[in-house]
């Protein structure tokens, strides 16, 4: 079993920007079973829009079935989240 560190860019709907702090808190308090969120930060994108940068350590190995996909699906399930993009990935 190994661990993977992944940095994500999480986009919200334009009309959900007022919920960005709530989404940051939801991501930060995610269940640690799939992955441990290390950092959550709001960053400017353009024209008053923001995105959330998330760094997480995710368990990887044969005993885990698609852990990255499960983590991403969980983030996408939060209200207002439209897209999640992998920015960086590496093994620990």
Task: Show the residue positions of the predicted features.
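Long, contiguous binding/interaction regions
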Residues: 1-92
């Amino acid at each position: 079993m190994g661990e993977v560190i992944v940095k994500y860019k999480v986009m919200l709907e334009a009309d959900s920007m007022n919920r960005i702090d709530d989404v940051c808190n939801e991501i930060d308090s995610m269940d640690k079973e799939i992955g441990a969120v290390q950092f959550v930060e709001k960053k400017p994108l353009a024209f008053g829009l923001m995105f959330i940068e998330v760094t997480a350590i995710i368990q990887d190995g044969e005993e885990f079935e698609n852990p990255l996909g499960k983590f991403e699906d969980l983030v996408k399930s939060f209200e207002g989240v439209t897209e999640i993009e992998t920015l960086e990935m590496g093994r620990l």
